[in-house]
Amino acid sequence: MVNFTVDQIRSIMDKKANIRNMSVIAHVDHGKSTLTDSLVCKAGIIASARAGETRFTDTRKDEQERCITIKSTAISLFYELSENDLAFIKQSKDGCGFLINLIDSPGHVDFSSEVTAALRVTDGALVVVDCVSGVCVQTETVLRQAIAERIRPVLMMNKMDRALLELQLEPEALYQTFQRIVENVNVIISTYGEGESGPMGNIMIDPVLGTVGFGSGLHGWAFTLKQFAEMYVAKFAAKGEGQLAPSERCKKVEDMMKKLWGDRYFDPSNGKFSKSAVNADGKKLPRTFCQLILDPIFKVFDAIMNFKKEETAKLIEKLDIKLDSEDKDKEGKQLLKSVMRRWLPAGEALLQMITIHLPSPVTAQKYRCELLYEGPPDDEAAMGVKNCDPKGPLMMYISKMVPTTDKGRFYAFGRVFSGVVSTGLKVRIMGPNFTPGKKEDLYIKPIQRTILMMGRYVEPIEDVPCGNIVGLVGVDQYLVKTGTISTFEHAHNMRVMKFSVSPVVRVAVEAKNPADLPKLVEGLKRLAKSDPMVQCIIEESGEHIIAGAGELHLEICLKDLEEDHACIPIKKSDPVVSYRETVSEESSQMCLSKSPNKHNRLFMKARPFPDGLAEDIDKGDVSARQELKTRARYLAEKYEWDVTEARKIWCFGPDGSGPNILTDVTKGVQYLNEIKDSVVAGFQWATKEGVLCEENLRGVRFDVHDVTLHADAIHRGGGQIIPTARRVLYACVLTAQPRLMEPIYLVEIQCPEQVVGGIYGVLNRKRGHVFEESQVAGTPMFVVKAYLPVNESFGFTADLRSNTGGQAFPQCVFDHWQILPGDPFDNTTRPSQVVAETRKRKGLKEGVSALDNFLDKL
């Protein structure tokens, strides 16, 4: 099976210019795992006959049954480029052998946290797009994440066999389809990228440069313009020139590639290229891409699928394809597969595209360092990362935990950015909450073993230098999900990953047999480790809650919990949605609360955020770590805040970074700074557990208007101020028309035209509304985009399929929070039911506490 040993891989690991770390990303069901197979079989790990069917990287049993990828899987490939191909590489290189660390990631939106983890440890991405359905919502989400992490994309148009056999497109129509997809992808890149002047330079994709592949993963064939340009250069050169040197040949091929795409036409009568669509005699000329590339492919398809024996034999001879004796007896689709696979092997084309156009760690870490490392940009660790220096201090990021075969232990999976990691090395293991100079979230322990990940297998290895992806044994006890591993004493953390979805659906679980409770608790701990997104919470009422990104995500998590992590039967509640609390107007009166000893008074008001500010805080455009003046200017310009107030933001909350703000608008108050910490603590408490039903607050700005304090410090300690601050904040919320917010999914549904009506019916029943409907050009498919409350999304997929005869495919992504209309204090409305249910579930007393409990008289 594997035709190279660990020692060989280890020797290449030192040639960091010849390493490529890349992930395969795409919309669900666009054929990532199938395509990955062609790469794996080229690099000699699957027998080539089974490629396209094995989906080697779907390692779990449920992945094979459901035919979807759930966890991202890593695999190392070895590929040698010929002298001729080496000439195309524009960055530094070292010999002709390349080590490609490939991560196949899931496309389903519920698992997009897995994608984030995969992106963090790679430098390049192969974006797969189904050429029939085009660029979908998930393609955009994933691509946006990749660009935010400064990862260079190359594009692969998959499923060309469908375009030819099912849709029977004409060559010109097919060219237009490709052209449109390339444009769509470039629009996304230019919207979220940093432009040509940015540190990465131009990352737009362009078939002319060879950064776009075309082909079919299922049939195992693919090409970029480079393959065809080479054929034609060889053909034209045969007419009288001898062997060319690799660099000259490279120039010729690159010139040829420019002629094979875009508005270039070919005149068969004299064999010349022209820029106009008609020749001198006024005859219409075919486009070069159609004539020189698609036409031969169409001919092969046509001859074989229509069983034209003589023509097929002629073509095979002309294309110089050598078939085995067993292949010669095949016909129809089987013969087509063998012929196309011999003529344009997918592995070759893709591996060449990857090695030539994706960056090596040496190239990539120069511009990724500032995004990855939180510390100062010139300390030892940062320099080590920037230069990818094996002699620098060890800096390694753990992006996720991978369960081992024996229950309960995990490999830590991550990438070495600087230094060398080796078995038995004593390292500093820093969790996400570690701050330099403090002891919390820091362990100093030896690494037990380092291992190589090979899809379904692991191989032990002595040590691994920087630029490589590796698994560690024995670190799992000290990290929950992610973290940084270093040998440098003053190292800061690598920056935490930003997830594009948030866990909004929760389920309560309990053991069927109460005696199994300890096992359940242990199982929940392991579950929290194994999935980057999942949150396991224990409520005050003693319930165990699991929060996930969506229905499917939770289903998989519960299955894992039951079968792998806790190994006990489990009872689960119906899924519940997390809500947020907010206010809709400014407080109707100035709120005052007195401290328990009656010596201190706080006066405050609450008001809602202007539209868009909460989202800016979520995205990190406005944050607690920003420089004061920059932030104040941003708030003043974009949201028309008063600059002096914007400079006096005390803090964000909950957790110091959430979408609520505490500002100080007082004028000349004595002792104010002494109680600042206590008020901030009260604010964090109040925003984490709101007054309506103890959910987080969102989008509320609290202003401290006035404070009267006791002159004696002993009478204004934390015990006096913190509870007072919380009471006054609650009073502010209650006087400012409090409202509930619910999470909303953006649903994208692909379906044929005739079932669009059925979709509207289902959405209307579930409080959804359609805001965009478009036809995918060149196909009979429609795309409907709608907003759907997460609360209504349970069973939505099944409902939709039954109403459309199984022809509609929905894809839900968490999009935004929206206010639930209605007053939570009016017993007839929806929000009041939600408040009552949530309070009951959390074991709080019935009914929201009255305003008098929080408000004091002067």
From Swiss-Prot:
Q: Which SUPFAM superfamilies match?
A: EF-G C-terminal domain-like, P-loop containing nucleoside triphosphate hydrolases, Ribosomal protein S5 domain 2-like, Translation proteins
Enzyme kind, highest EC tier = hydrolase
Q: Which reaction does it catalyse?
A: GTP + H2O = GDP + phosphate + H(+)
Its cellular-component GO annotations read: cytosol; nucleus; ribonucleoprotein complex
Q: Which residues carry this modification: Diphthamide?
A: H715
Quaternary structure and partners: Binds to 80S ribosomes. Actively translating ribosomes show mutually exclusive binding of eIF5a (EIF5A or EIF5A2) and EEF2/eEF2. Interacts with serbp1; interaction sequesters eef2/eEF2 at the A-site of the ribosome, thereby blocking the interaction sites of the mRNA-tRNA complex, promoting ribosome stabilization and hibernation. Interacts with habp4; interaction takes place at the A-site of hibernating ribosomes and promotes ribosome stabilization.
Q: What is this protein called?
A: Elongation factor 2
